[in-house]
Amino acid sequence: MKDEHRHQILIDEEWKDLIGISSVVKILTNFSQAAYYGSRRALMGLGYDPKDAPEALKGFRNEVNRILTLNPEEQQKALKSAYTAHAKYAKDRAKKGTDSHEILNKWAQKCIEENEGKFLTTGSFLADEPKVQKFLELAIPHIGKDARIIASEKKSYSEELWLAGITDLIVETADGKIVILDFKDRPVIYENDLLQMGGYSFLFPTPISFVLGVPLEGKEARPWFAVDKLQEAFKGLLTAYKFLNQFK
C-alpha cells in the first residue's frame, strides 16, 4: 500500500477501499465522556476547570468580567473560542502524537538499519530523545532489553477481512515471542487500544504472542496475552461497524 492509498488495495488496476482498523474501533466512542470533556474545555476557556476546588473561581470571574467589557463582536469571538476549545485541544494532541510517532519511527528504523533491530539506547541517533527513553522505560520490563525490532510503522492489510492498518512497532523477544506494540501520547492505555491491537494482529501471518500498549505520558505499559480473545472481540466489533456503515 502506498501512502496515498493507505487503506486501499489494488485489484485489476483499480484501487479498492479497505476498512481502517482505527475506524472500526472508533464506533466505541463514549459520547457521554466526550460531552464531559468538551464542556470541560469550554469552561476552561472561560477560566474555570471543573476539576478545581469549588472556591477556585477567581480566574472565571476575571475572564467573565473581561468579556463583559468587550464590544458584541469581540464577545462573540471570545465565546466561540471557548466553544471550540476542545476541538483545538484535540487537534493539538493529535499533532503531538504524530510528532512522537515520527521520532520513535526514525529511531526504530535506525535500530533496524544499524543494529540488526536491537535497541539503540544512549549516545546514538535519537536514543536520548525523551519519548524514546520513555518508551524504553515502559516497554523493556515486558519485552526485555534484548528484544529485536522487526518492523516500524508497518502498513499491512487482510484481504480476508478487508482490513488495513499501520502497526506502530513489531518486535521479537529474546525467547522468540512476536509482540505488537502501540504508542499513545497520554497517561493510560484503554480497552479500545487493546482492541485496536487485536485488529492489527489479523494483518500478519505469524501468530502474535501478546500485545503491549505504551502510554508515553504514563507510568506503566499495558500488556494483553489472550490475543485470541481480542481477535474474537474485534470481529464482533467489525460486524457492528459494517452494520452501522450501511446506513451512511
Give the role of each language-model region.
Residues 1-163:
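Metal-dependent nuclease catalytic cores that hydrolyze phosphodiester bonds in DNA/RNA
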Residues 130-131, 154-248:
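Nucleic-acid nuclease catalytic cores
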